[in-house]
Amino acid sequence: MPLLTRITGPRDLDRLSLEELTQLAEEIRTFLVDAVSKTGGHLGPNLGVVELTLALHRVFESPKDKVLWDTGHQSYVHKLLTGRQDFSKLKMKGGLSGYPSQGESEHDVIENSHASTVLGWADGIAKANQVMERDDHVVAVIGDGALTGGMAWEALNNIAAAKDRPLVIVVNDNERSYAPTIGGLANHLATLRTTDGYERFLARTKEVLERTPVVGRPLYDTLHGAKKGLKDFIAPQGMFEDLGLKYVGPIDGHDLEALESALTRAKRFGGPVIVHCLTEKGRGYQPALQDEADRFHAVGKIHPDTGLPISTSGADWTSVFGDEMLKLGKEREDVVAITAAMLQPVGLDKFAKAFPDRVYDVGIAEQHGAVSAAGLAHGGVHPVFAVYATFLNRAFDQVLMDVALHKCGVTFVLDRAGVTGTDGASHNGMWDMSILQVVPGLRLAAPRDADQVRAQLREAVVVDDAPTVVRFSKGAVGPAVPAVGRVGGMDVLRAPGTGTPDVLLVSVGALAPMCLEVADLLNKQGISTTVVDPRWVKPVDEAMAPLAERHRVVVTVEDNSRVGGVGSAVAQALRDAGVDVPLRDFGIPPRFLDHASRAEVLAEIGLTAPDIARQVTGLVARLDGRYDRAGAEVDQVEAARD
């Protein structure tokens, strides 16, 4: 009987021998490769934390002790050890989340997937424990690049200020950037420095020497400096010790005995401690280890033996952008690129290979990236900052005060905009068009197809006196959606027949094919429809108000929050122009969306062609005085969804 099937909770690990734990680690890696190859998910990071997670759950008593995960995609092993072994629907509707989830287990504390936040959480929980006089331990696991985020260092600065507040910080270093521990002396120093006796010895020595006339303080400083210099020569601990944090490591993150020993010492220390673990991303899976650039950080469905994708769906939005950036780079030497530790996921890998001196990876530091972009623009180049839409939220103040206020020509390219689906609430890029509406001078484009991505990216990088934004969806890009005409700066995708048109349907971005389907359904009901794509949704095109005035109803459809989005902006523009036409906006309701496929999420929130057509039909019927019970029921359903 496999050991893994006998693990129903963390305490089941206590009775296992070292040999059995080693076997369990192998079983977990086999399970992860098999399960994630069928569903997709974050494979490489989880293969690297198997032994670390086993050790954490043997040393600490979750859920009484709080085990917190930064960049929560490292939590698959944690899920397996806390009673969640059904990975058959990982990241699918009704299945396990790809991140920690309070709704799944009492062992999950924070539902995070945005990096560098866990130390702030740990600081707060440790403070609460102290106030409430609880003896619970707090363990924060941070790594996979998250220490490149400024928030992590802000938290460390606060954590270090409380020497008597217990908090264990595990640095999961899978980048192989630190040297291994050198010999027994380093091990001895690491052990000695996290014991109460050693701390008392240092305190007494300092007290005695400082009372000694003339030579006391200089002698203590000399001895302490020599000790520190020796330890810093042996192990890369200086940056943590300079903050006042005790340091254990580096520890082999795949040596269970060493891990348990280090974590046990840290647990007993009684103050903030760094435990530095060296792990190997993708460990035990040869295709991941051979992928030096990414180590299978996140994968779709793959062949487990080879790691090759099972199928490809043609060109995707990201690759279209990446290819066009490469062309722009060849044409314009002043175009540079910025990424926040996402070079390949945002499509800048080809640009980086061709122009290594014109691409800047700022780490998981979107705030710094935006300010650095402002400086680049001030210096005469045009930066293109490619980032997931959900992560731009972190840099809003910098976009507003450093880029827009200074009228800097910076282009932000927002990948994964709108409903992304399987990555859940924290990864849906559903707020960008709302929060960016308030930024003076900013121009925002929402391309509907690959041709428009190329065209609007080129339009954006010409602007040198204001920030520009180009947003697009996740996944396959689909066929081109041709325009049949032009009104102002807007593309007409469907012109009405003869007579007064009923509905002006404003289609935003990738929802254009669905909006054309809505128009077809309305036409079958005898409702004539004009479909327009604004292309640039901020500012609202000046031709919008006079065009709306020639219709009976205006309908906006966007892959963004209904609150403060494009629909709200169009409504305000019509009011300002004195155009009194009913407007119905369709978008994402103001709530967090559970993980499911994009199609399932859109269906659940009523953002489908049949749903929209039914409601617009009811609205037109009310205008005609043909309001009926069916129309009322439609409104009630929509109200419930909101």
Curated annotation (Swiss-Prot):
It comes from Streptomyces coelicolor (strain ATCC BAA-471 / A3(2) / M145). Disulfide bonds: none annotated. PROSITE patterns: TRANSKETOLASE_1 (PS00801), TRANSKETOLASE_2 (PS00802). This is 1-deoxy-D-xylulose-5-phosphate synthase 2. One of its GO terms (biological process) is terpenoid biosynthetic process. Binds 1 Mg(2+) ion per subunit. Binds 1 thiamine pyrophosphate per subunit. Keywords: Isoprene biosynthesis, Magnesium, Metal-binding, Thiamine biosynthesis, Thiamine pyrophosphate, Transferase. Thiamine diphosphate binds at residues 73, 113-115, 145-146, 174, 285, 366. Its cofactor is Mg(2+); thiamine diphosphate. PANTHER family: 1-D-DEOXYXYLULOSE 5-PHOSPHATE SYNTHASE-RELATED, 1-DEOXY-D-XYLULOSE-5-PHOSPHATE SYNTHASE, CHLOROPLASTIC. It comes from the Bacteria. The keyword Metal-binding applies. Catalyzes the acyloin condensation reaction between C atoms 2 and 3 of pyruvate and glyceraldehyde 3-phosphate to yield 1-deoxy-D-xylulose-5-phosphate (DXP). Belongs to the transketolase family. DXPS subfamily. Homodimer. GO terms for molecular function: 1-deoxy-D-xylulose-5-phosphate synthase activity; magnesium ion binding; thiamine pyrophosphate binding. Mg(2+) binds at residues 144, 174. Coiled coil: none annotated. Its EC number is 2.2.1.7. GO terms for cellular component: cytosol. Pathway: Metabolic intermediate biosynthesis; 1-deoxy-D-xylulose 5-phosphate biosynthesis; 1-deoxy-D-xylulose 5-phosphate from D-glyceraldehyde 3-phosphate and pyruvate: step 1/1. It catalyses: D-glyceraldehyde 3-phosphate + pyruvate + H(+) = 1-deoxy-D-xylulose 5-phosphate + CO2. It is an enzyme of class 2 (transferase). Pfam families: DXP_synthase_N, Transket_pyr, Transketolase_C.
